[in-house]
């Protein structure tokens, strides 16, 4: 069994990192990818910032800053800007949704013509490109925060989307991470068998405010399971984790356990061979992990 504390990190590669945090990107960012920063704001925080730069990780007289995000507790604002050849552009401001002493989740998604910025899974701003994103070389976080994890990944997905698990199956102890934003009345995440059976059907339904769990084996649906919370909200992003344990699949939403589904297959360490995602969902990331 894996404890809830072991699940709370929402990404398989998350580790605590020092601040300031400086990363030189080894690959160019691509549209559809998301930069994720999460941690805890210091109790006495005044400001922290995130910068996407080229040429140097430091802001100087000749800097190129494609995106500057300044979270200001002393002003109650989040300020967005860019810098070209050492000169700041025009600021764009929104209210600051973060609080001193609390956990935060800040995400920057790259699109063809803009950055989409979300705070605690809710979009707060779109920043149109002023400089080409393709020249971004550095990703820097500074200021009054403690970082629990920094990573980037994802892509654009067309639904329905289907993929096989690495090594051909989902072994006991492995996890599936699904990142997305609900956009309509329902979506589903299905764990598939080799013969096409749906061994686990995960189906949030907004009109009913229920998460329906079931299995379709031999073209026959079994008994629905509907108990438990409904934590989803339209247009609010989520991180889901599905943990394959010997007797059940444990389900976590944004780090909190939301339910379990007892296996309806004889060999759960071998029988889940793939995943299918469909419905009214903007899928932003999908990952598999041993731990």
Question: Where do the language-model regions lie?
Answer:
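Peripheral membrane interaction modules
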Residues: 1-118, 122-239, 243-252, 256-291
């Amino acid at each position: 069994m894996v404890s809830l504390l072991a699940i709370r990190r929402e990404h398989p590669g998350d580790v605590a990192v020092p601040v300031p945090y400086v990363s030189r990107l080894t690959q160019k960012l691509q549209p559809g990818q998301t930069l994720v920063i999460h941690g805890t704001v210091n109790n006495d925080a005044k400001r922290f910032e995130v910068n996407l730069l080229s040429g140097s990780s430091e802001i100087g007289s000749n800097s190129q800053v494609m995106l500057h995000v300044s979270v200001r507790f002393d002003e109650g604002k989040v300020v967005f800007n860019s810098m070209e050849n050492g000169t700041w552009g025009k600021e764009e401001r929104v209210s600051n949704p973060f609080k001193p002493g609390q956990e935060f989740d800040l995400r920057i998604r790259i699109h063809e013509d803009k950055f989409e910025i979300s705070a605690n899974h809710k979009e707060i701003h779109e920043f149109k490109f002023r400089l080409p994103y393709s020249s971004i070389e550095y990703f820097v976080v500074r200021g009054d925060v403690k970082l629990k994890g920094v990573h980037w990944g994802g892509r654009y997905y067309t639904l329905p989307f289907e993929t096989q698990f690495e090594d051909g199956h989902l072994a006991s102890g492995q996890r599936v991470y699904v990142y997305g934003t609900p956009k309509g009345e329902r979506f589903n995440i299905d764990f598939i068998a080799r013969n096409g059976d749906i061994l686990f059907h995960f189906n949030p339904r907004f009109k009913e405010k229920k998460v329906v769990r079931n299995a379709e084996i031999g073209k026959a649906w079994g008994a629905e399971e509907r108990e438990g919370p409904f934590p989803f909200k339209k247009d609010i992003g989520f991180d889901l984790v599905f943990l394959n344990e010997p007797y059940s699949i444990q389900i976590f939403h944004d780090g909190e356990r939301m339910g379990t589904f007892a296996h309806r297959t004889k060999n759960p360490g071998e029988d889940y061979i793939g995943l299918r995602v469909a419905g009214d969902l903007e899928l932003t990331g999908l990952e598999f992990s041993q731990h």
